[in-house]
From Swiss-Prot:
Keywords: GTP-binding, Nucleotide-binding, Repeat, Ribosome biogenesis. This is GTPase Der. It comes from Escherichia coli O127:H6 (strain E2348/69 / EPEC). GO terms for biological process: ribosome biogenesis. Coiled coil: none annotated. Pfam families: KH_dom-like, MMR_HSR1. Residues 377-461 form the KH-like domain. GO terms for molecular function: GTP binding; ribosome binding. GTP 1 binds at residues 9-16, 56-60, 118-121.
Amino acid sequence: MVPVVALVGRPNVGKSTLFNRLTRTRDALVADFPGLTRDRKYGRAEIEGREFICIDTGGIDGTEDGVETRMAEQSLLAIEEADVVLFMVDARAGLMPADEAIAKHLRSREKPTFLVANKTDGLDPDQAVVDFYALGLGEIYPIAASHGRGVLSLLEHVLLPWMEDLAPQEEVDEDAEYWAQFEAEENGEEEEEDDFDPQSLPIKLAIVGRPNVGKSTLTNRILGEERVVVYDMPGTTRDSIYIPMERDGREYVLIDTAGVRKRGKITDAVEKFSVIKTLQAIEDANVVMLVIDAREGISDQDLSLLGFILNSGRSLVIVVNKWDGLSQEVKEQVKETLDFRLGFIDFARVHFISALHGSGVGNLFESVREAYDSSTRRVGTSMLTRIMTMAVEDHQPPLVRGRRVKLKYAHAGGYNPPIVVIHGNQVKDLSDSYKRYLMNYFRKSLDVMGSPIRIQFKEGENPYANKRNTLTPTQMRKRKRLMKHIKKSK
């Protein structure tokens, strides 16, 4: 499960600035959910290939009378949902009563907490943080988030070791594996099949969406249609339920974020605070079903969730629920709105269903299987290079400073989502429009449906870079003869 890091502290201590620093590597959108957590942002970040979800919890305000009375209920829940807390204080303002009250609450939760003193630029860090040792949270990590000072150290010496302890990462030398395959192809040898068979694994399917769009009804309808015995397998995140099931001989694991089996135990506050569980379900899934309410249309919250799904690279099936009972005129209007607002997602299948009555539900799994198969299909280097060559023949890359961009070869860089790595010269100068052309060409040629496809470009190294242009003895003799000839002709 993808770990969650929460940034907490008083207002104006620099939480949002640090949040932007942490998430910039993924260009993360940041999913803003108005109405649920108006002052809270969620984003994806990465440390040395390890992803985590970062939460900016907004300011927790309070006085010496007791900060707990001022804490927003959802901020407390954010701390509960997080795996680790970065407690931020303002080194310039010094120790405040609100800091002490927040620290007291964090100590009572026994949650892994790291104390981060921000705004230390221009100060002696050792002197600036002395007072904060009174909070009893151990070592203090001074940073200047606005300038980036100390942030890298915070990542490398605090978050990374903690994440390694949480889930050690298996190291795979992907470059060595690729070059071994490439060399084998050059020598005319067969590509060796690896042991990975995606068809033998269950498809992890997450059903996500806003509250009250019919996620629970759809989950119950799917399980009811199957007539199989299911059991709850609680995940590491509270109230997320993993439900194994089988359909048409294929195994699935339904990831239900609505807590349908523990509904009676969930308070209204926890039910509303489903954002963390939803984001973790997306990260953990192979295919995501985004459920939209046909009567309410596409909301900003739907688009935020959609942005997170796309950034995660997950396969996608869009489900428009509550389709029954709508007039033909309203249905046409809904379809026009979908085309207008979701036109940029041309790879995802859209289904119109009624989870309550079961109409259209049976067709969903065909699209789920198609999306999963597209995202996990293995394609060889020779095939990808051939497709790239055909794309270049159909539409030449643009000229850059009078020289044509040269694409040399392509190979697979990963799966789920499919990643195509293209090597060439001056590829960094390719326009966005040509990159989109290549992406669409690969999608059409490989018949990828239901899954995003990503293309990465790698610049070829110039073997003569930083080398002096020294002539060989033969070249020197030719040059002398040429100069003599030129002088005679004059």
